[in-house]
Amino acid sequence: MVAACSAYAAVNVATQWAGTRTGIPSVIIAFWQYVIALVLTLPLLVRDGTRALRTSHFGLHVMRVALAAAGVQVWIYALTHVPIWQVVALSMTSPFFVILCARLFLQEKVTPARLLTTFTGFIGALIIIAPWSDSYTVYSLLPILAAALWAGYSVMTKYLTRFEKPASISAYMLVLLTPINAALWLASGLSMSAITAPDVEIWSILIVIGAFTALAQYFQTAAYSIADAVYLQPFDDLRLPINVIFGWIVFAAAPSINFWPGAALIIGASLYLMRQDSGTSRTA
């Protein structure tokens, strides 16, 4: 999991570099990121054959992946306008959105402890955004929007597990994400020719982003295959300090003073939530 967090941090740094230093539009970054990742993971799909694509809920798969694609687009756009440390910290509000979505759409029970945890997490996000400060911009809300979209994706994934096999759910994620990102790119009207950076620099950074995306997903899947999610959660939270370190090394960008108390509230609420869920599972 630590390797996965490090790989994702490399993706975030490379994505911010591509958007701010190379001038590649976010829709183009998103498209090539997952095309390259798909190519690198294609051998795994070929191994399972067309069996993984058999489904009677194709429409739900499309809706689920569309939410994921929208989250990716918003995430990458945020990385071109907001410091890495802020983007990553605010994205960690996703579990709290999952609680709200699960209550609204899956009718799952929400305990007072979960409500308090959710409220605490959002207070942490508010402290990081600091809408009362002069440095606040509307771009600061983008990571929260991405977190909400990914929460919708997670809830739909959980719903699909009632009918679909994990292999089918994973396969459709990879297969559908590329055409959806392609459609968003075409709708934007942008082209590769609009990028003024040298081709070598453009393709080098895009390949790095795609390769580390595939690597991060592999490490993450491997981690969840050998350990429980509750055990891995503290290691997953390491992505925040790892991203802060990477961002500081590459961009010399240090977090603001608001970051630390806000991040502490978000991580603390997340860990408490995981501990509560672990206790509930053992009781059941």
Swiss-Prot record:
<feature type="transmembrane region" description="Helical">
    <location>
        <begin position="136"/>
        <end position="156"/>
    </location>
</feature>
<dbReference type="Pfam" id="PF00892">
    <property type="entry name" value="EamA"/>
</dbReference>
<dbReference type="GO" id="GO:0005886">
    <property type="term" value="C:plasma membrane"/>
</dbReference>
<feature type="transmembrane region" description="Helical">
    <location>
        <begin position="195"/>
        <end position="215"/>
    </location>
</feature>
<dbReference type="InterPro" id="IPR000620">
    <property type="entry name" value="EamA_dom"/>
</dbReference>
<comment type="similarity">
    <text>Belongs to the drug/metabolite transporter (DMT) superfamily. 10 TMS drug/metabolite exporter (DME) (TC 2.A.7.3) family.</text>
</comment>
<feature type="transmembrane region" description="Helical">
    <location>
        <begin position="58"/>
        <end position="78"/>
    </location>
</feature>
<feature type="transmembrane region" description="Helical">
    <location>
        <begin position="115"/>
        <end position="135"/>
    </location>
</feature>
<feature type="transmembrane region" description="Helical">
    <location>
        <begin position="167"/>
        <end position="187"/>
    </location>
</feature>
<feature type="transmembrane region" description="Helical">
    <location>
        <begin position="247"/>
        <end position="267"/>
    </location>
</feature>
<feature type="domain" description="EamA 2">
    <location>
        <begin position="141"/>
        <end position="273"/>
    </location>
</feature>
<feature type="transmembrane region" description="Helical">
    <location>
        <begin position="26"/>
        <end position="46"/>
    </location>
</feature>
<feature type="transmembrane region" description="Helical">
    <location>
        <begin position="82"/>
        <end position="102"/>
    </location>
</feature>
<keyword id="KW-0813">Transport</keyword>
<keyword id="KW-0677">Repeat</keyword>
<keyword id="KW-1003">Cell membrane</keyword>
<keyword id="KW-0812">Transmembrane</keyword>
<keyword id="KW-0472">Membrane</keyword>
<comment type="function">
    <text>Transports riboflavin into the cell.</text>
</comment>
<protein>
    <recommendedName>
        <fullName>Riboflavin transporter</fullName>
    </recommendedName>
</protein>
<keyword id="KW-1133">Transmembrane helix</keyword>
<feature type="domain" description="EamA 1">
    <location>
        <begin position="2"/>
        <end position="129"/>
    </location>
</feature>
